[in-house]
Amino acid sequence: RLLDRPNDRTPEELRHLQPWKGGKNWGGENILILPPSLPYMDAFEEINWLNKLCHTINEFTGRNLVIRPKPAKGKKAPPWDSQLATAAAVVSFGSNLAIDAMVKGVPTISYKYCPAFFGSFKLEDLDTDALMEEPDREKIINNCMYHSFHKHEFNNGFAWETSMENAYGS
Protein backbone atom coordinates (compact mmCIF):
# COMPACT_ATOMS: atom_id res chain seq x y z
CA ARG A 1 0.00 0.00 0.00
CA LEU A 2 1.17 3.50 -0.85
CA LEU A 3 0.19 5.90 1.91
CA ASP A 4 0.63 9.65 2.22
CA ARG A 5 3.52 10.07 4.60
CA PRO A 6 5.38 13.20 5.71
CA ASN A 7 9.05 13.60 4.86
CA ASP A 8 10.15 13.70 8.51
CA ARG A 9 11.97 10.35 8.19
CA THR A 10 13.38 11.03 4.71
CA PRO A 11 17.12 11.79 4.66
CA GLU A 12 18.07 15.14 3.17
CA GLU A 13 19.84 13.56 0.18
CA LEU A 14 16.62 11.79 -0.86
CA ARG A 15 14.58 15.01 -0.74
CA HIS A 16 16.37 16.62 -3.67
CA LEU A 17 14.91 14.96 -6.74
CA GLN A 18 16.74 15.43 -10.01
CA PRO A 19 14.78 16.27 -13.18
CA TRP A 20 12.78 13.43 -14.71
CA LYS A 21 14.42 11.77 -17.74
CA GLY A 22 11.70 9.46 -19.01
CA GLY A 23 10.32 9.13 -22.52
CA LYS A 24 11.19 7.52 -25.82
CA ASN A 25 13.35 10.47 -26.87
CA TRP A 26 15.49 10.39 -23.73
CA GLY A 27 19.02 9.67 -24.87
CA GLY A 28 19.93 6.92 -22.45
CA GLU A 29 21.60 4.23 -24.49
CA ASN A 30 21.28 1.25 -22.13
CA ILE A 31 18.79 -0.60 -20.01
CA LEU A 32 20.53 -1.20 -16.68
CA ILE A 33 19.50 -4.50 -15.08
CA LEU A 34 20.04 -5.10 -11.35
CA PRO A 35 19.60 -8.83 -10.71
CA PRO A 36 19.40 -10.17 -7.18
CA SER A 37 22.03 -12.45 -5.73
CA LEU A 38 21.66 -16.18 -6.33
CA PRO A 39 20.54 -16.90 -2.73
CA TYR A 40 17.91 -14.15 -3.02
CA MET A 41 16.62 -15.53 -6.34
CA ASP A 42 16.56 -19.02 -4.86
CA ALA A 43 14.62 -17.85 -1.77
CA PHE A 44 11.90 -16.41 -4.01
CA GLU A 45 12.05 -19.37 -6.41
CA GLU A 46 13.09 -17.01 -9.22
CA ILE A 47 16.39 -18.63 -10.15
CA ASN A 48 15.75 -18.03 -13.87
CA TRP A 49 14.59 -14.40 -13.45
CA LEU A 50 17.53 -12.85 -15.27
CA ASN A 51 17.41 -15.31 -18.16
CA LYS A 52 13.65 -14.84 -18.64
CA LEU A 53 13.98 -11.07 -18.37
CA CYS A 54 16.72 -10.85 -21.01
CA HIS A 55 14.66 -12.87 -23.47
CA THR A 56 11.48 -10.89 -22.78
CA ILE A 57 12.90 -7.37 -22.69
CA ASN A 58 14.15 -7.62 -26.28
CA GLU A 59 10.51 -7.62 -27.42
CA PHE A 60 10.21 -4.03 -26.18
CA THR A 61 13.56 -2.35 -26.81
CA GLY A 62 16.58 -2.55 -29.04
CA ARG A 63 18.78 -0.77 -26.50
CA ASN A 64 21.83 -2.46 -25.05
CA LEU A 65 21.29 -4.43 -21.86
CA VAL A 66 23.84 -3.78 -19.12
CA ILE A 67 23.72 -6.28 -16.28
CA ARG A 68 25.08 -5.04 -12.97
CA PRO A 69 25.39 -8.01 -10.62
CA LYS A 70 25.89 -7.43 -6.94
CA PRO A 71 29.63 -6.93 -6.43
CA ALA A 72 31.25 -9.96 -4.83
CA LYS A 73 33.64 -9.50 -1.94
CA GLY A 74 36.99 -8.35 -3.24
CA LYS A 75 35.58 -7.60 -6.69
CA LYS A 76 34.92 -4.16 -8.09
CA ALA A 77 31.99 -3.10 -10.21
CA PRO A 78 31.98 -0.05 -12.49
CA PRO A 79 30.87 3.09 -10.64
CA TRP A 80 27.09 3.15 -10.17
CA ASP A 81 26.72 6.79 -11.20
CA SER A 82 28.58 6.24 -14.48
CA GLN A 83 26.37 3.26 -15.34
CA LEU A 84 23.23 5.15 -14.35
CA ALA A 85 24.25 8.15 -16.48
CA THR A 86 23.83 6.08 -19.67
CA ALA A 87 20.64 4.29 -18.59
CA ALA A 88 17.31 4.91 -20.28
CA ALA A 89 15.71 2.80 -17.52
CA VAL A 90 16.65 0.56 -14.60
CA VAL A 91 15.11 -2.89 -14.14
CA SER A 92 15.30 -4.38 -10.66
CA PHE A 93 13.94 -7.42 -8.87
CA GLY A 94 14.50 -5.95 -5.42
CA SER A 95 17.47 -3.58 -5.27
CA ASN A 96 17.54 -0.40 -3.20
CA LEU A 97 19.50 1.15 -6.09
CA ALA A 98 16.14 1.47 -7.86
CA ILE A 99 15.26 4.17 -5.31
CA ASP A 100 18.50 5.99 -6.13
CA ALA A 101 17.65 5.76 -9.83
CA MET A 102 14.22 7.29 -9.13
CA VAL A 103 15.80 10.11 -7.11
CA LYS A 104 18.12 10.79 -10.04
CA GLY A 105 15.20 10.89 -12.49
CA VAL A 106 15.68 7.55 -14.25
CA PRO A 107 12.54 5.45 -14.81
CA THR A 108 12.47 2.10 -13.04
CA ILE A 109 10.80 -1.20 -13.75
CA SER A 110 10.58 -3.05 -10.48
CA TYR A 111 9.13 -6.27 -9.23
CA LYS A 112 6.96 -6.70 -6.15
CA TYR A 113 9.86 -7.12 -3.74
CA CYS A 114 11.51 -3.85 -4.73
CA PRO A 115 11.17 -0.69 -2.63
CA ALA A 116 10.64 1.29 -5.86
CA PHE A 117 7.68 -0.91 -6.87
CA PHE A 118 5.07 1.86 -6.50
CA GLY A 119 6.86 3.98 -9.09
CA SER A 120 7.39 1.11 -11.47
CA PHE A 121 6.68 1.06 -15.14
CA LYS A 122 6.20 -2.10 -17.23
CA LEU A 123 8.56 -3.66 -19.74
CA GLU A 124 6.04 -2.75 -22.45
CA ASP A 125 6.60 0.93 -21.57
CA LEU A 126 10.23 0.88 -22.70
CA ASP A 127 10.88 3.18 -25.66
CA THR A 128 7.39 4.69 -25.39
CA ASP A 129 6.07 7.99 -24.12
CA ALA A 130 4.59 6.18 -21.11
CA LEU A 131 7.97 6.80 -19.43
CA MET A 132 7.38 10.55 -19.69
CA GLU A 133 4.74 10.36 -16.95
CA GLU A 134 6.69 11.01 -13.78
CA PRO A 135 5.53 8.97 -10.79
CA ASP A 136 4.98 10.73 -7.47
CA ARG A 137 8.57 10.10 -6.43
CA GLU A 138 8.38 12.16 -3.24
CA LYS A 139 5.35 10.21 -2.01
CA ILE A 140 7.01 6.89 -2.85
CA ILE A 141 10.25 7.76 -1.08
CA ASN A 142 8.50 9.15 2.00
CA ASN A 143 6.38 5.99 2.13
CA CYS A 144 9.50 3.79 1.98
CA MET A 145 10.93 5.57 5.01
CA TYR A 146 7.95 4.32 7.02
CA HIS A 147 8.95 0.71 6.34
CA SER A 148 12.32 1.00 8.08
CA PHE A 149 12.73 1.35 11.82
CA HIS A 150 15.28 1.99 14.55
CA LYS A 151 15.67 -0.46 17.42
CA HIS A 152 13.98 1.83 19.95
CA GLU A 153 10.94 2.06 17.64
CA PHE A 154 10.43 -1.69 18.04
CA ASN A 155 10.64 -1.30 21.80
CA ASN A 156 8.20 1.62 22.04
CA GLY A 157 5.60 0.09 19.70
CA PHE A 158 5.99 2.58 16.83
CA ALA A 159 7.30 -0.09 14.44
CA TRP A 160 4.35 -2.42 15.11
CA GLU A 161 1.76 0.35 14.89
CA THR A 162 3.23 1.73 11.67
CA SER A 163 3.58 -1.73 10.11
CA MET A 164 -0.09 -2.47 10.81
CA GLU A 165 -1.05 0.89 9.34
CA ASN A 166 1.10 0.16 6.27
CA ALA A 167 -0.60 -3.20 5.82
CA TYR A 168 -4.20 -2.42 6.70
CA GLY A 169 -4.63 1.36 6.76
CA SER A 170 -5.43 3.61 9.68
What is each residue range found by the language model?
Residues 63-108, 113-115:
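Donor nucleotide-activated moiety binding/catalytic core segment of transferases
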